[in-house]
Amino acid sequence: MVSRFFSWTNEKPLGDQRAHLPDSFLELEQEIAIREEGLSKLFQATTIWIDSILKKVDGEDKEKCLACENLGKVMINHSKELPQDSSYGITLSQLGKANLKIGEHQTSLAYKARVCYLDFLKRYLVQAKDFHSARKKLESRRQAYESLLQKSFKEKKEDSRLEEDIRLALYKFEESTEQVKNRMIALKDVEADQYQQLTELIVYELNFFKESTGILNTIFNSQNSLTPQKKIQSSERSVENEFLASPMDPSLSKLFTKTTNTEKISPTPFSTPKRKSKKETVFVKAIYSFTGRNEKELDLHTGDVIQVSEQLGPDWYMGEKVNSKAEKLGNSGMFPVNYCTRIYDLHVQKSHETRSLERARSIRRIVSDDPRDYCSPIKQSPIQNLKFLDSDNSLLSSQNVEASSQPIKIRKPLPEIPNK
């Protein structure tokens, strides 16, 4: 082997007498370096996280405890100073005890994270440190081997002792190369264990948050069951205040006056249930025809007036048809919002329609030379009729005018049916 080496070195220049590592070895070494750097950062971040979980503060009793435990103790102590029947004091005491339990679970989480994950990262970094020691040893043997190669290249005569040294140096270099390679493969194969430890950490964190959420949900449910009547009264007061603060529609002023007069006859004072009768009544007018797709939907014709009883969502109303005197006609159901427009006074709306007809007849008298009865209905096409009335800012349709043609049916895209 040595003789073959000398025959090879006699043909090569001096600069090529070096021991080269395989490309696969160098690629594996680069991958291990990336893994080691990432796990080193994970170890530092995990250490900071666990330390923050276990960080203790000075409590009221001058004892070290977790921040949430200190908060729980303060809540419990303050709740004892409040009356025993105080809902606030009861809830404060329950939340304080909950924080103490959460502190116990928090300590358990930190302990499990340290044992299952942090210690595992620490063991990996120890193995990586041993790998670096073996890598330094390999580099030292490589340099020794290359030094002997350089020396043998300069020698003009064959030296058996030098050949033996080269053979021994090559053996040590190959041995160290194999050892370092095995260590790198072992560090790479740890990925399966890393995945298992990471999964356990996820389970520990998930259990912690589940237990904490369960504790808080128990308190929340008990807190809701303490004073349900007070919450109902509070919500009723807020609704009443909002109603009283809103202006009243002119169409309901007469109705309100009659209601007030009848209430003055009664000897009982004005109570909260009577205020609910003041709820604003909403009227809308159909500006498009709509055919219901099932029994629950209300058929609409252009010009129909509907009293809205409930809004099922942003796109649907529930209501009943009424006449010009706000008398219910018995047809009720749900209908789309975008097929209607809101009106505020049925009487004003009716007078607007009358004035629009009179104005149309007056213009007919002015612009026409045909000697005919100008009080007869104006006969126009539906499109002309609608355009003319739109200029008068009126919501009249062709149904309100005695025309020879049928009203135009206009459809708009139907919204989605609400889940009710």
Swiss-Prot record:
Region (Disordered): 398-420
InterPro entries: AH/BAR_dom_sf, BAR_dom, SH3-like_dom_sf, SH3_domain, STAM
This protein's UniProt keywords: Cytoplasm, Meiosis, Nucleus, SH3 domain
Residue span, BAR domain: 10-232
CDD domains in UniProt: BAR_MUG137_fungi, SH3
GO molecular function: lipid binding; membrane bending activity
Record domain SH3: where: 279-345
Localization: Cytoplasm; Nucleus
Pfam families per the UniProt record, alphabetical: BAR (PF03114), SH3_1 (PF00018)
GO CC entries: cell division site; cytosol; nucleus
Any one Gene Ontology BP term: endocytosis
Entry-linked SUPFAM superfamilies: BAR/IMD domain-like, SH3-domain
Predominant subcellular localization, coarse grouping: cytoplasm
Gene3D superfamilies, alphabetized: Arfaptin homology (AH) domain/BAR domain, SH3 Domains
Keyword tRNA-binding applies: no
Keyword field contains Lipid biosynthesis: no
Function recorded in the entry: Has a role in meiosis and sporulation.
UniProt name for this protein: Meiotically up-regulated gene 137 protein
Origin species: Schizosaccharomyces pombe (strain 972 / ATCC 24843) (Fission yeast)
Gene: mug137
